Structure formats: structure tokens, C-alpha cells
């Protein structure tokens, strides 16, 4: 704490001295520029700015594919402000260190897209040109935290700031220009995984068809796969306006369970909550003229469900149990869902059609 107060005092002293000198710039970032320059001096940052005016503190070159302006970057990162306060992160260790770890939350690399206007200018300046496997720690001044693109630092300095200065510590895990195919390929790798368990069986053993390993080409429709786990008691399709009851468990491709109606499963995966009722949920079986399954809803309040979940149900018959695996366009797309499902995440749902609860 003393070091922080001392640093702030030194910065204030430098700013006071600078106020007597001729102003280097004018405009909305005049004070920001003076403060930033003073902060660099107090913290002995002696590196020269590069690109638009970012300061690269550490850099390890990757050996994989180069990040360009037309794709999707999978990366781990930690961001902090100039005072050292962590403002965002992807890693589980950081969450644990901050006392913010939640078992059901997702921790790991996340996708951002690199298209023009989707990244802050300074962040894009740091990321574009990096290669998969590369690492960089960089300081990005507040005037470069803008989604607009200009040709020079002076043009950014003339704009109103949108965000404070940022220290960005990033590692590139992967890069693709074809995100849907990337997800489908990930599903294919999941089918062949020997370590992830599906109801106590390795995924590689579950996803077999007549003794042959399921492949990405075995989709029922693009990005959607279904595997029967228990045969139905009747192969007749459900009539319209039918109500059925199911138990389900939702997972990501790494085997992490994020939601379930089964109490034992919740406890086994350490996501149990005493505030939640673990019991079969009602499914309202209906259809629409356009896609057949779009009218399926959940609960007495007819809650809408994601397409992949509905499409899994659409494959099923009375008392059947099965597993649906699908890419994010049939799930939560680029936005993900809360803290448990990241953007561009394929999902797995194990669904068990059961008898109506007696109560």
C-alpha cells in the first residue's frame, strides 16, 4: 500500500512540474497523456512505443498460424488497470487467487473475433500479426482503447476516450477463419476422446455406430449429432400437444457439467445447490410448420429452448434416452450463456424421457 501511495505522490509531483511547461498536446486526452507519461516514468517503463503507440513489455513468438483481420482468436488473457487491479481474465488460477472461483463457471481460453471494429484499436494492434502459441504483455494507453480506426496516434489523441488504459497479458491458443468448421472438428475430437466420461463410459466408447467410430460427417444435420443410449418402448412419433417429462444433463466438450436436473449428478460434479429443485421437467411437445421442432417448449410457462436441445428431443420416442451434441449456431452462438457457457461453444445434452412425477 505504501508503494501505491508513493507512486501516486510521484506522479502528482511530475504532473505538477509538467503543468508549468508548454503543453505537448491539446484536446480531450491532454490530461490522460500527461498522467500516462508520468506513470511510465515512475514505473521505470523504458521501452519504446510501437505500432499505434502501444508498449510491449514481454513477447514470445508463436510457431503456429498467424492472426489476421478476418477470423476468430482463441486466447487466454489477464487484463489490469495501471494500478494493478485485475479487470478481466480467463484462467482458473486467477479466479482462485481472487477468491472468485465458481465450480459451474467456465475457465479457459475464449474466442474473440478480429474483424474491423470488433476490437479496441490498441488491442488489435497488439494481436494482429501474433502467431498461435505466442505470448505478449503490452500496455495500451486509454486513447487507443477505441473501436474506431485511425491512421496515427495523434488522431486517436484527438478523440474522447472510451476506456481507461489497460495492461494486457495474452497467449494465443488457436486461430481460425472458419469458426463453424472449427467447432465441428472439435466435436470430432470429442467423439474420439478416451478421458472424458459420459455416464462412466469413455466418450470414444459411447460414440460408436455398429462398431465404427462416429465422425463429423455423421451429422443428422450440419453441426448436430444424436446417439441413442436406451431404446424407446414405442417407436411412434409423439402426437402434437403431448406433454412429456425428462431429466437432462448439460455438458461442454471438456466434460464439464454446467446444468442438470439429477441431484446425484449435481453432487458428483460439485455443482449442487440447495436452492434448486432436482426433478424431471415438463416438455410441451408441439411443432411449427417451418422446422418441425421449433414449437417445443419447457415448463408450465412454455419457456423457449435452444434449437440443439429441441432437435435432440425431436429424435426421441417414448421412454428413450439419448445424447445430442451440437455446435454453437444451434446453441448460444457467439454470446454464450452467463458465466458457464462461453461463446462459440459446442454443447452436449444427455436427455432421459421418464414417467410423469407422481406429485
What are these regions, as identified by a protein language model?
Residues 1-20:
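Sec-dependent bacterial lipoprotein signal peptides
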